[in-house]
Swiss-Prot record:
It comes from Listeria monocytogenes serotype 4b (strain F2365). GO terms for cellular component: cytosol. Pfam families: ATP-grasp_6 (PF18419), GARS_A (PF01071), Glu_cys_ligase (PF04262). Residues 514-768 form the ATP-grasp domain. This is Glutathione biosynthesis bifunctional protein GshAB. Its cofactor is Mg(2+); Mn(2+). It comes from the Bacteria. Mn(2+) 1 binds at residues 721, 738. The gene is gshAB. Keywords: ATP-binding, Glutathione biosynthesis, Ligase, Magnesium, Manganese, Metal-binding, Multifunctional enzyme, Nucleotide-binding. Its EC number is 6.3.2.2, 6.3.2.3. HAMAP family: Glut_biosynth. Monomer. PANTHER family: GLUTAMATE--CYSTEINE LIGASE.
Length: 769
């Protein structure tokens, strides 16, 4: 078969691609390492309805399922995002990073997963497992690696090497069966290289290979994976299926079901399964539709990786499957599954001692010799078909190092750390570290960092609910959400089907906004609008002794705004006009309302969040210049540009320069220690301001005003900016200065100070109510 790829550049490229999907199980635990007995987090909805986040056997055993992707990078990003979403939504709990369980309660207290109805088939199946195998063994967790070759690759090979009168599906079945056969023979190598469950609590399992660790936990003396050993999660007795043909494979499983050995194909706990995408997953469905992908079930959770698996491990497994496709039939044992099982168990229980294996002729061969034989073949086909790919060769070299030096295996490293720290403490420390890493980047959707932060937030919240998300226009932050037959189109997180087009036009035009609000007795600042800069300049005498705001007529985010609270010159006024007219063809000059500016986020006639916005500022230290202080403050990892992070970097543009000049300062001025220097008069977070949550503290009086303003304009998702007087006695002197039809949500979700609000959830509730 190798020659087919050497002769065809297109097939060579396709060989190293594929379709990938991952399923990962983690147990939810309390902060002291005990099985969490809380229900599955409600935000994820019914398990039957969420395609991404379900439970495995136990209510406490969460399962994350990626969609099928076309690269290892993208499937890894999906898994990372799901892990982060689940971690952040599992309040006061952690995700246990090991395949072997945490501290467990009595068998009868381990909760089986709950479903919509007590007689759900999923519930009944789990009750069957609990009765047949016990609950504790069901809590062994791991990763399932789903893979299929590109259809174009199958087509190309079918044209070249199919048998006479062989249908394409029969050919496809034969190829996948061949890969599965290679996997079954050589899976011991995969367990040696990826196994990560050699340690466990003493009351969970006992084998003749046990040794006690200092904390009282147990370890396989030279073992690699309890989960993949005979003491792990296996069928009650060995089930050998016939890999010589697809029909024989189907017949084998059917016979075991008819004999009552297993209830259904779901209970066939083979390390690799042939599957199709039909949801019933019955043997009859597989027989009818044929093989569509392979499911590898023997991958342990790697406690040394926050995601439970590394990209290199994913890439190596892919190479392992490619090797199966390229293998010659003579390389495969003639259906000697018992020998393959013995090799698997031997490595799982004794792999670090590198015991001798049995080859197809039942002769002993060293682990190193057998492993290097396969790894060298992988290296050879990479060199032959993809010589420029040094990364893949490096992955193979890493596996060789583990083979030659057992102490470098994942299992050996885990055992060493557990011996040092203790079983529970090590895994808890890992879980806490991973949680801290997740929390530090909680605002982020991996792989969507180029999109606005508010878009990333609502996308993550949609995933949590099992809502399908399609990116329609990445540059425009335009998404489609689908839950069942319900479809919603959303742009920039808050432009939705609930918007009234005329309402948007009114809010876009600040003059119209003020007129309409004033007509409904809602207080707004008085002022004039100008479309001619010369006429606006001539009006200087009307404003020179007043506190004023100069701003563009139709912009958001505080761009182009200048505020004069103190005496200003004609030159200052002219510069403010220059700035405002650079953003719009018309500007507004209006009275300045004293007080503090607050953003009220109103969704469907309810104030969901209130934010106090502090203008962009720096605090002096008596040493550094204003410019240097700005540069230092901008190094905060939570500050970015273009709404990609919770806070915006402070700019050093004309608006900030003007603000400094109004204070008789420049960028080279050195403020005194603890002296606060404001770089902006307007307090928009979008221009570098700081955000402080005030939702609970805000007087309901002003919340009602915000709601009334949105009702006047028939705005359903709206940011209302209100100047609130500092003295309660003056509250009637408030004023609405702006209504925003596309309010940013990220500043409420991740404020500089105060409680984080789940605004994405609120918008999704509104859209899918």
């Amino acid at each position: 078969m190798l020659d087919s790829f050497k002769e065809d550049p297109k097939l060579r490229k396709l060989l190293f691609s594929g379709h990938f999907g991952l399923e990962k199980e983690n147990i939810r635990v309390t902060s002291d390492g005990k099985l969490a007995l809380t229900p599955h987090p409600a935000i994820f909805g019914p398990k039957e309805d969420n395609p991404y986040i379900k439970t495995d056997f136990s209510e406490s055993q969460i399962e994350m399922i990626t969609p099928v992707t076309d690269s290892i990078d993208s499937v890894y990003e999906w898994l990372e995002n799901l892990h982060n979403i689940v971690s952040l939504r599992s309040e006061n709990e952690l995700l246990w990073p090991s395949s072997n369980p945490p501290i467990l309660p009595a068998e009868e207290d381990i909760p089986i997963a709950e479903y919509k109805t007590p007689d759900s088939p999923d519930r009944k199946y789990r009750e069957h497992l609990a009765k047949g195998y016990g609950k504790k063994i069901q809590l062994l967790s791991g990763i399932h690696y789903n893979f299929s070759f590109p259809e174009a690759l199958i087509d190309g090979l079918y044209d070249k090497i199919s048998l006479p009168e062989e249908s394409k599906q029969d050919f496809k079945n034969r190829l996948y069966l061949k890969v599965a056969k290679y996997f079954m023979k050589n899976r011991w190598l995969l367990i040696y290289l990826t196994g990560a469950s050699p340690v466990y609590l003493a009351d969970f399992s006992k084998t003749k290979h046990d040794e006690s660790l200092p904390d009282g936990s147990s370890a396989l003396r030279d073992g690699i994976s309890l989960r993949n050993s005979n003491a792990g999660y296996k069928n009650k007795e060995a089930l050998y299926v016939d890999y010589n043909s697809f029909d024989a494979y189907i017949s084998s499983i059917s016979n075991y079901i008819e004999a009552g050995k297993i209830e259904s194909m779901r209970e066939f706990y083979n390390p690799i399964r042939l599957k199709n995408a039909h949801t019933d997953q019955t043997v009859e469905s597989l027989a009818e539709h044929g093989v569509e992908y392979l499911e590898i079930r023997s991958i342990d959770l790697n406690p040394l990786e926050s995601n439970g698996i590394s990209k290199d491990e994913l890439a190596f497994i892919h190479l392992f499957l490619i090797k199966g496709l390229l293998s010659e039939d003579r390389e495969l044992c003639s259906n000697n599954q018992q020998l393959a099982d013995e090799n698997e168990n031997n490595i799982a229980l004794n792999g670090l001692a590198q015991p001798a294996l049995k080859n197809c002729d039942n002769e002993e061969i060293s682990v190193v010799e057998a492993g290097l034989l396969e790894l060298n073949k992988m290296s050879d086909f990479i060199q032959s078909l993809r010589p420029e790919d040094t990364k893949l060769q490096a992955i193979i070299e890493k596996q060789k190092e583990r083979l030659l030096h057992p102490e470098k295996t994942i299992a050996a490293q885990v055992k060493q750390q557990v011996t040092k720290e203790g079983y529970v403490d090590f895994h808890l420390n890992q879980a806490k570290t991973y949680m801290e890493e997740t929390e530090a980047l909680a605002y982020k959707l991996i792989g969507a960092e180029d999109m606005e932060l508010s878009t990333q937030i609502i996308w993550k919240d949609a995933i949590a609910r099992g809502i399908k998300v399609d990116v329609l226009d990445r540059a425009e932050n335009f998404l489609r959400f689908q839950k069942g037959d319900h479809v919603e189109y959303v742009k920039q997180a808050s432009k939705t089907s609930k918007d009234n087009y005329v309402s948007v036009l009114m809010m876009e035009n600040k003059v119209v906004t003020k007129l309409v609000l004033a007509e409904h007795d809602i207080r707004v600042p008085f002022g004039d609008s100008f479309s001619d800069q010369a006429l606006a300049l001539e009006a200087f005498s009307l404003f020179e002794d007043k506190q004023i705001v100069v701003k563009p007529k139709s912009t958001n985010y505080g761009w182009g705004i200048s505020i004069f609270k103190n005496k200003f010159t004609l030159e200052d006024y002219q510069e403010a006009l220059n700035i405002a007219f650079s953003y719009d063809s018309s500007v507004i000059i209006e009275e300045f309302i004293p007080g503090d500016e607050f953003r009220f986020l109103v969704i469907n006639d309810k104030v969901e969040a209130v934010l106090k916005r502090v203008p962009a500022n720096v605090t002096g230290d008596g040493i550094h210049t204003v410019r240097e202080l700005v540069e230092e403050k901008n190094t905060d990892p939570l500050r970015g540009t273009d709404h990609l992070k919770p806070l915006e970097k402070i700019r050093t543009g004309p608006e900030e320069t003007l603000m400094l000049s109004m204070q008789n300062l420049s960028w080279d001025s050195i403020p005194k220690a603890e002296e606060i220097i404001y770089l902006r008069e307007n307090s928009n977070v979008s221009t570098g301001g700081d955000s402080i949550d005030y939702t609970e503290e805000m007087d309901d009086y002003f919340k009602e005003i915000a709601i009334r303003a949105t009702q006047v304009l028939d705005a359903k998702i709206c940011g209302v900016d209100i100047i609130v007087p500092r003295e309660t006695i003056d509250r009637d002197k408030h004023a609405i200065i702006e209504l925003n039809f596309n309010p940013a949500m990220h500043m409420h979700c991740f404020p500089y100070q105060g409680e984080k609000k789940k605004i994405g959830d609120k918008i999704l509730d509104f859209l899918f109510e």
